[in-house]
Amino acid sequence: MIKDNIQNRFKNLRSVYFIGIGGIGVSALALWCLKNKIKVFGYDREATEITKNLQFKGATVFYEHESLSKKNSKHQNVLKSFKGKNYSIVVFSSAINKNHPIRKYFDINFVKCIKRAEFLGLISNNYKVIAISGTHGKTTISTMLTHILKVGGIDCSAFLGGISKNYLSNFVDGDDNIMVVEADEYDKSFFYLNPNIILISSLDRDHSDTYPTFLDMKAAYKHFVHKNRANLSEIILKKDIQINFPEFESVFEYSIIGTADYSLNYKKNNLGDYTIS
């Protein structure tokens, strides 16, 4: 069993190795590291626009065809450099299982690997966090909210589940102590977050490998909210969603159709543009 204090490592962080660095969630974390002058190394199966952009910004990325079996290769030397260091962290995406050769290498050499969600939790602990959750709509809402905050004078940071057309990135940097994150229910990843505001956009049965029944998923959302009770200033729910929190005072609903605490009115002109109020 590997005993480690990841929080202490994070405080002194100098380098990170990302297994599955080309994934949309992991690559955003890599961009944050690069912005904060932390050395970034990583692996993915093939080169993509995402991995090429990371390399352009300073990351060292290795691909599947670069064999680990070749002694003293650059990749092998990088992996060795993470052994016994108290200022480095290895992060893996949810797509990487425990039998992946790089994860196995680190396990054999007693190097602790942590999930993407745990690393995001470590980062977000230094911010006031707005967590966007729900089985559908997280990326759209997170991106819209980030842009609204930016143009409204709040220079927030954000980790998005897609590439924003406004910012050409899945990581949006900001100088204010506000962060927008997608709170992913898959594999109960959102349990690593400690948000100040939680929005739940939808609740449908999904991820049957994690939640055998809808009630299991609903219970996870309940736990996500309750574990953060001390931090929460408000909870925002889509109207008529199949979950409620009567035990909390600051719970608000939003809707496009009908009345709610937050509602949206929009008009479409002849050019196809919308006016929203």
Q: What do the PLM-derived regions correspond to, one by one?
A:
Residues 39-53, 156:
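NAD(P)-binding Rossmann-fold cofactor-contacting core
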Residues 4-9, 18, 32-35, 56, ...:
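Phosphate-binding loop of NTP-binding sites
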Residues 260-277:
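Acidic-glycine-rich active-site phosphate/pyrophosphate-binding loop
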Residues 13, 127-129, 273:
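Short coil/loop residues immediately preceding or within conserved phosphate-binding loops
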